[in-house]
Amino acid sequence: LSRALLSDTNNNTVIITTRQKLESALRHAQKQKEKRNVERFKKLLGQHIVFVVDECHRALSAENMDEIKQFFPNSTWFGFTGTPIFEENKKQAKGQLARTTHDQYGEKLHTYTIKDALDDAAVLGFQVEHEDTIEQTSLNNHIFKNLQVNEKYASYSVDGINDMIDQMPPVEKEEYLDATIYERDEHIQKVLHKIFRPDNAYMKFDFQNGRPRKSAILTTSSIDMAKRYYHAIKEMTKDPSWIQREFAHHPIRTGRTIEDPDFPRIAITYSMQENEVDSAQNQKEMKKIIKDYNAYYGTAWGIDDIDRYNGDINNRLARKKGEFKEFGKQIDLVIVVDRLLTGFDAPTIQTLFVDRNLSYANLIQAFSRTNRTYPDKTKGLIVTFRKPHSMEKNVADATRLYS
């Protein structure tokens, strides 16, 4: 990259690179300046360089941009994004650094919103369902216990506290729910039984002639939760007659069949950055997960080539290449934390299952994995499993902001 930037033959040339590679080149140049007093990019100081940044709402922080501008002071910046950061969802303050996309890149030159894309039939609309795994009585009891030990309500009678709970808006009630409540095995089992209930799975994975034709993503709050879901699904489906056993009271409707013995084919994918916390333990478990993956698909990936493993998952999920269009080569459900939720294009993804909190840009980006047009696909299907009233509000807020 450094040679390309400094080459005399590269005038009026477009160079495509990554933020990481550019930053690495600049760090190397800085070390040369400190050690040898050599200005490696001195010849570029007066040149007009244009930077075009894709996914600019997240690809380059304001701090990183300022550092790059120190090397290229005569630069012009353009940003492309489907989800700019606005005042409503601006980033946390960090000195005088920009907190919105407007602050970082300047005035917008053009807009093409979700509404425009829908009007042009370039994308599909969303059908959103908000599932609740916590019964209302349990939630009210949980809130009651919290208020009863709060000094602010020490003078309230039992009836007084109950009356106050009855008058609480649903979103306010959900503020009393700790994340740990959704990390219980009971919650995981309820989610899985909602996902794989035969009538539901038939629609969400678009079964035809007993086989799934579309894929889904399950996004969770952490790598630990992702792996717990993986193991729970493996345990639930290890018996060939698991559907009949688990859903004896939810028979599939007449005319609908689920006859694929390997359904659901599942995988976990994550970025190395996501895996930095508790890395040793995470990698130990991932070795076993990758071993299972290799055994099924006949691959030979390892923890040392995690990027190639992730790439293989991408291909099997997207089903764009001929070798992955053959039935049985695909993945039905991929479990992620953040990976694949931005910029990944796979029209065969029909459903996003959400077991975490999402809002604004992250919500729209994640939902948009499902809205690519594809034969016999009419909507992007979204199912959320945490704080249904809060998520309903988040969806409304994000849709209003980005439409």
Show the residue positions of the predicted features.
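Conserved segment of the helicase C-terminal RecA-like domain
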Residues: R369-A398
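SF2 helicase catalytic motif II
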Residues: V38-F78
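Inter-Walker segment of RecA-like/P-loop motor cores
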Residues: L1-Q32
